[in-house]
Amino acid sequence: RPCYIVSVGNYKTELKAADFETAFAPLEKEAEPTMIVIPEAVNLADADCYALQQKMVEHCNKMMSRISILDVFIDKYPANPAVKVDYVDKFRNGFSTNFPSYAAAYYPYLNTSVLSDTDITDSMIVLKDNVTDFIMHIGWEEAMIASFTAAFLKEGSSGEMTKDINQALLQNSVVYQQLIKAVKYDLNLLSPSAAIAGVYCSVDNSRGVWKAPANVTINSVVKPSATINDYEQEELNVPITGKAVNAIRTFPGEGIKVWGARTLDGNSQDWRYVNVRRTMIYLEQSVKNA
């Protein structure tokens, strides 16, 4: 099954919501995509993330051949970590659409094992940016950031020199070890939408589009970033507003599973389930293209 990747910029430039919105026009010319995923949307401010997600759903309604997989925005670097925030409630209040059956939302983020220590130290740009974020978050001075960058992350440094410095620091510097550990944790804490797209494809291939993409294990995940119990699951799945959010949960002896397959149109008798909406899309497009 092909995957269409639409470039909206590069890794050195901070992207804005408007940059991501340029991806929709090229996709309107393509008939094959059956789902839209923008995992990077959560890197925007919360309001911009919700606005971009609304554009995703509008695009899906316009095309009538695909569905949006959305992440519930979580602030990875809150101004006051001691204050508990209900991000699901913020999502329900901040995101709105007239076409809820064309979207499904998932929560929480996933602590993954995708990147190793070697993957992190091999990427100078990523290391520089994330070390800077981490140092700023814990309150160190900008002068220390500049010193760290000048000493260890110079453009044009040879691979062997960088490797030697990295090994020396890992063996002798507790602070550096903590930085690498923090960067590794940060980079491996991923929003779930990309993984959920993989779950959809896996279920499509093994069973069919009519099968609910739920009760399915996700690979390369250590644990969800939040623990959800049965009571919280019920509130996520069947809210009064109908904006259902699908949970990702850990079950003893079974591992980590996607536990829900509802669209954001939870109060609809016809379109509350992802597999029903996607099956109808499949049938409509099959007839249209016959």
Describe the residue ranges of each PLM region.
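A glycine- and small-residue-enriched flexible loop/hinge signal that marks low-structured segments
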Residues: 1-290
